[in-house]
């Protein structure tokens, strides 16, 4: 089975430039391969089998970044096409934008090219990066890949994917059951009559967020003050997101320990958020994310 651990990393100025360069090259190769596939199919009515290696002669600066990051960009594109062919409702693969809120790249652990220590992380074609590791990684976990990302707030993170042995859990008859139903106020209601008591973090921060966004609208676009204020707005959103995730992690963990089986109603949350003026409330609840956490 696979386990993921997300950690905060603190790259210096040179390392930040290298990370941004790798993210940019991964985005470029994804978009270029997608454009060439579309163009080739329009002419030949066949799928083009292109690889990142075929672009390095024309674009030699691609050699400056981690080749595994480019290979993963190719895998992500192929995965997007498979999803589209399997389920057209997912939509045709789209170009990646430089202005996307969250930018990232993925590299794989091969032949000791990635080194993880208590306070440092060594990535391919990069010097050692300072990190903050909040938990001890078991010695029998094998590192598979690392995804480096930059959040809108400017913070950098590394998501470490490990391969570990399946944990055998003794099966026993379910005795303690709980039913959960969606609720606009408090996120959900339990069959015991209790409510989850979700504090509605977005609603509480709405006035402050509106004030910061109003300041942003008055700044000259792309100026230094604009970038500073944009970061403040991103930090507000990040705090709300972290508060929501912390609450849901703790609640899902508590329910998983107290009950043997939990039954939930199958709802079209996307449809609910799109109609009846419920969008803001449904998205603030994060009910879908809570069910996902409860599942694992």
Predicted regions and their residues:
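Short amphipathic alpha-helical segments with coiled-coil-like heptad repeat character
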Residues: 18-23, 85-88, 257, 263
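Short, Φ-rich (hydrophobic/aromatic) sequence segments
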Residues: 26-37, 73-76, 80-81, 85, ...
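Gly/serine-rich nucleotide phosphate-binding loop at the start of the catalytic core
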Residues: 1-70
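Long, hydrophobic, amphipathic alpha-helical segments used as structural scaffolds
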Residues: 34, 38-41, 81, 85-92, ...
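Hydrophobic (often cysteine-bearing) scaffold residues that line and stabilize catalytic clefts
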Residues: 15, 26, 66-73, 244-251, ...
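Positively charged, helix-rich recognition surfaces that bind polyanionic ligands
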Residues: 3-6, 139-142, 152-296
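Acidic carboxylate diad motif detector
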Residues: 50-152
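Generic detection of short hydrophobic beta-strand segments and adjacent strand-loop junctions
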Residues: 7-9, 129-135, 196-198
């Amino acid at each position: 089975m696979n386990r993921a651990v997300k950690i905060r990393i603190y790259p210096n100025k040179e390392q930040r430039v290298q990370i941004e360069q790798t993210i940019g090259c991964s985005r470029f190769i994804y978009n270029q391969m997608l454009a060439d596939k579309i163009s080739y199919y329009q002419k030949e009515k066949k799928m083009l089998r292109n690889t990142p290696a075929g672009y390095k002669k024309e674009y030699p600066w691609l050699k400056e970044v981690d080749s595994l990051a480019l290979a993963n960009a190719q895998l992500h594109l192929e995965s997007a096409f498979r999803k589209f062919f399997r389920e057209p409702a997912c939509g045709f693969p789209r170009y990646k934008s430089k202005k996307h809120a969250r930018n990232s790249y993925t590299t794989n652990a091969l032949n000791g090219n990635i080194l993880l220590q208590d306070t440092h992380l060594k990535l391919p074609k990069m010097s050692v990066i300072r990190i903050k590791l909040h938990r001890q990684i078991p010695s029998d976990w094998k590192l598979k890949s690392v995804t480096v990302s930059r959040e809108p707030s400017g913070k950098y993170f590394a998501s470490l994917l490990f391969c570990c042995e399946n944990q055998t859990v003794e099966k026993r008859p379910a005795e303690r059951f709980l039913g959960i139903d969606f609720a606009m106020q408090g996120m959900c209601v339990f069959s015991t009559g209790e409510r989850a008591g979700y504090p509605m973090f977005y609603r509480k921060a709405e006035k402050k967020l509106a004030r910061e966004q109003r300041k942003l609208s008055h700044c000259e676009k792309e100026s230094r003050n604009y970038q500073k204020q944009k970061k403040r707005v991103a930090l507000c959103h990040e705090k709300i997101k972290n508060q929501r995730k912390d609450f849901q992690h703790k609640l899902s963990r508590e329910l998983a320990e107290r009950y043997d089986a939990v039954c939930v109603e199958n709802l079209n949350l996307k449809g609910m958020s799109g109609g009846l003026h419920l969008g803001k409330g449904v998205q603030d609840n994060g009910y879908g994310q809570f069910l996902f956490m409860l599942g694992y």
